[in-house]
Amino acid sequence: MDVQIRKIAWGAPKNIIAYHSTKIGGWSDGAFASSNMSLDVGDNPKDVKKNRESIIKQLKLDSKPVFMKQIHSATVRAAKSPSDNLVCDSCYTTIKGLPLAVLSADCLPILISSNDGNKIGVIHAGWRGLASGIIQKFIKRFSRDPKDLVVWIGPSINPENYIIREDVFNKLSKISTKFFSRTKDVGAWHLDLKYVAKIILKQEG
C-alpha cells in the first residue's frame, strides 16, 4: 500500500510544492510500521526504499530527493545532487527540480523558501540544534534578508509529553523562557519546540 501523503499549504510561491507523509500505508513492520523513511533507526533498508519510492512515484518526481544523515547538529550544507552524502541537519538548494527531504519524529521539520521561489531549504530542529543556533546559521547562509523568506513549521512532540531537565533549560533559556512551563517535579519543565522556533525566527526578522 502506498504511503499516504498530504500537500502542505504554506504560502510559498506556486512553483514550490511541499508534502508530508503520514503513518498510513508503507511497507515497514513492527515498531517502524508502516511508513518509516529513515535508514538510521534499524528498519529493513528494503522496506525503507519501498516507502521512499512510493512517494517518488506518487509525486512523479524527475529526481530522487536529497535525504540528509541527521545527527542533531547545527550544520548547514548546500545540496547539489540526490547522491550527496550530507551529514547535517539542514540543507538548501538553488537547483530547479531537486527535491529536499527532512525526517522527523519528536523534532521539528521546518521548510523554507525564498519569496521568488529560486531557493528552498529544510531544517531538522531538535533542542540541540535550536540551542546551537541551527535556524540562525541557516538564515545566514540562505538569505541576506530574512523578510524574504516563507516558512512552514511542521508537527512535533506535544509540550505536555516533552519534559526536559535543568541542563537543557539552561541552554535554551538564553534565547527566552517563554516556551517553558513547570511540571510537578522540581528541576523539570515542559518544552514547546515549535514556540522556540517561532521566537528565534521572530528575533531573526
Task: Provide a role label for each language-model segment.
Residues M1-G205:
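Active-site microenvironment for binding and transforming phosphate-containing groups
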